[in-house]
Amino acid sequence: MIGNRLLRKMALALLLGGAALLPHGAHAQGAKAAAESLFQAAKQLMADKKFAAACPKLAESQRLDPSPGTQLNLARCYEGLGKTASAWAEYKGAAVLAHQLGQKDREDGARDLARELEPKLSKLTIVAAATPGLVVKSDGIEIGAASFGTALSVDPGEHVIEASAPGYEPWRVTVTIGPNADAKTASVPVL
């Protein structure tokens, strides 16, 4: 009986250990296939001008199998949604990835598209006085003190700015940023 149990455990260990060696190649192929399926579905959605449905599929395709082509399409999709800062960032990312892969034409094209968007980028500047323990967030993402006073590229729309510090009342404001090079400043009051 003990021998059978030991044999079963050894067989299970070999099976699991061997399985751990397989997923790299098998998983990579599965990820590539899933990425391609998502990409094709997104391309059709974009052709139908359904950008809100297409962009998440492209983002997931890019996560599963990063490529400059997918990233360029994601940027175009964000442009279709009016998310100029997101599109600009994806174009710049696609240029970097294309450069790393030696795809000069794609690199140049992505850089040109990013450059074309730059004059249209809307900006948000957050100004805050030094308060011990101050934490400032924009749309839930912490903004470091080095960013204070710098015009940051943001997508048009509403942005929630929050500030808090130990021993102080938290502060919150919603700033609406328009398209086409709108610029707004959110001034965090002394808490």
Which residues does each PLM region occupy?
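Acidic, Pro/Ser/Gly/Ala-rich intrinsically disordered segments
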Residues: 1-191
